[in-house]
Design a protein with these regions (language model features):
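Terminal (and in a subset, N-terminal) low-complexity or junction segments at the ends
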Residues: 1-186, 195-471
Length: 471
């Protein structure tokens, strides 16, 4: 087939190599032969630009394996040396980023830098997305220096990319400085800072920034509203939630049937404790997706509406919507609130056997909490010991709370030891252990724990009243 590329056409010109290269099945299965027999002169003198052919292949490839083969071919044929414009590098970096391969995207960027090709205003936003996925803030700082040297730091997309990166790394001061330095900032930069604050647990600051955006005369878009409704949900501010719901339909680029926007409203009302309003939004959706159902289930579970949460899950399955790992966190949380051990174990097994979902730490945590609250402390301990990952402070805390509830001194001491090793600065384990001892009348042990806390400066000294009986 490769040889057929060299035969003469009806007008004595070489038949286009692209006719074969654009056949993806040929390209991916014959990559080694393609490299060995590639006739560079024929392809560059034909009417088809090899760089365009590669760009088409990049847009058509569907798997990471195909993308790796394309990039390997590009490197072996020195195509990027023949066409050194950043456009071709950008295409490859973008393709890796879209396929959730940020490390490979970064490697391609480094190869681009080594080859002497300077990034442009399209390169930096793409690679910054990859760095956000990697939380590679140090590399981001180096890129910031590059952007300053090339005068790209004030570009709207570069600016929002750096704000996103700093926010995800928890460097909100740097993100804010980046935002403030440009007096002519665009909506993308506003969205980046609001989204970063919202996702970083700074809901009040996100709301304040949104108010500032409105005062500056900007009309929010769908991206703004998704971020700000999430922030509002974190504050559980119903009054603000109702105002934001009205604001949604005044925003730019908001489709009234947009699932992402409607799901954010469901989540917001759920966190505000108004499941009736969440259900109203849910029921009016043209089509509910897995996030819609999950938001309802999690909302019901959060507020102790056990029957409603489990009924919603049943309806979800009947509707043919496949649950994900977040859905099962909601379902198991409902079982915890309801104290239904058998149902919790049933759904935990269903998640693994029926849907093939590998349990996360949150799922194990729910089951440990469920067993502990029911007084099944041995079973809860066994689950902690047999989990494929190490328990975090939340899981240990659930078990510690169960030990306090049921007055189990021996297990309480065992859990406290692990909590102290995990978080030696945290006085919570000592306080609960002291309470367990007190519930059993073990006052010497109570004094011993208090002395340890005092020596390690883990608790404040007891307060004293300044008043006297003569006052």
């Amino acid at each position: 087939m490769i040889r057929s590329c060299r035969i003469q056409g009806p007008n004595n010109t070489a038949i286009s190599f692209a006719d074969h290269l654009l056949n993806r099945s040929f390209f991916t299965t014959s990559i080694v032969n393609l490299d060995a027999q590639f006739n560079l002169q024929a392809s560059t003198t034909s009417h088809d630009d090899p760089a365009k052919i590669i760009a088409t292949q990049l847009s058509n490839c569907t798997t990471l394996q195909e993308l790796n083969q394309i990039y390997a071919h590009v490197i072996r044929t020195h195509l990027l040396q023949l066409y050194p414009a950043p456009f071709h590098w950008n295409n490859i970096i973008r393709s890796y980023t879209r396929r959730d391969a940020p490390t490979k995207a970064l490697f391609v960027y480094l190869a681009m830098s080594r080859s002497g090709v300077l990034p442009d205003c399209y390169t930096l936003p793409i690679i910054l997305k990859a760095l956000c996925q990697l939380f590679a803030v140090e590399v981001g700082r180096q890129l910031h220096s590059v952007a300053l040297r090339l005068g790209l730091d004030s570009n709207e997309y570069c600016e929002s990319g750096f704000i996103n990166l700093y926010s995800k790394a928890g460097e909100f001061e740097n993100a804010r400085n980046m935002f403030e330095q440009n007096p002519e900032r665009k909506l993308g930069s506003w969205n980046a800072i609001i989204g970063g604050l919202s996702q970083g647990g700074r809901a009040k600051e996100a709301i304040d920034t949104f108010m500032e955006l409105r005062k500056c005369g900007f009309l929010p878009d769908d991206v703004t509203m998704v971020s700000i409704t999430s922030a509002c949900g974190s504050l559980s501010d119903l009054g603000l939630a109702l105002q934001l719901h009205k604001c949604v339909y005044q925003a730019k680029n908001v489709d009234k049937s947009d699932a992402l926007m409607l799901n954010s409203l469901i989540d917001m009302y759920g966190k505000c404790g108004r499941m009736d309003l969440a259900y109203r939004v849910f029921s009016r959706m043209e089509q509910q997706n897995v996030s819609s159902w999950t938001s309802m289930i999690v909302g019901y579970a959060m507020h102790g509406h056990v029957n409603e949460a489990l009924e919603c899950f049943r309806c979800m399955r009947e509707a043919g919507v496949r649950p994900n790992h977040v859905t099962f966190v909601g379902v198991l949380s409902a079982c915890v609130h309801g104290g239904t051990v058998q149902e919790g174990e049933f759904y935990f097994d269903m998640m693994k056997s029926t849907y093939g979902i590998k349990p996360h730490l949150q799922h194990y945590g729910c089951l440990v909490d469920l067993l502990g609250r029911a007084g099944l402390l041995k079973e809860a301990r066994k689950m902690v010991e047999e989990m494929p990952m190490k328990a975090n402070s939340v899981v240990w805390g659930c078990l510690m709370g169960a030990c306090e509830k049921h007055g189990n001194v021996k297990m309480g001491e065992w859990v406290a030891k692990h909590l102290q090793e995990l978080e030696p600065w945290n006085d919570g384990a000592y306080v609960v252990l002291s309470n367990i001892y007190a519930s059993r009348g073990l006052w010497k042990e109570v004094e011993r724990v208090r002395l340890i806390m005092y020596q390690r400066k883990l608790a404040k000294a007891p307060g004293y009243s300044l008043s006297t009986s003569g006052d």
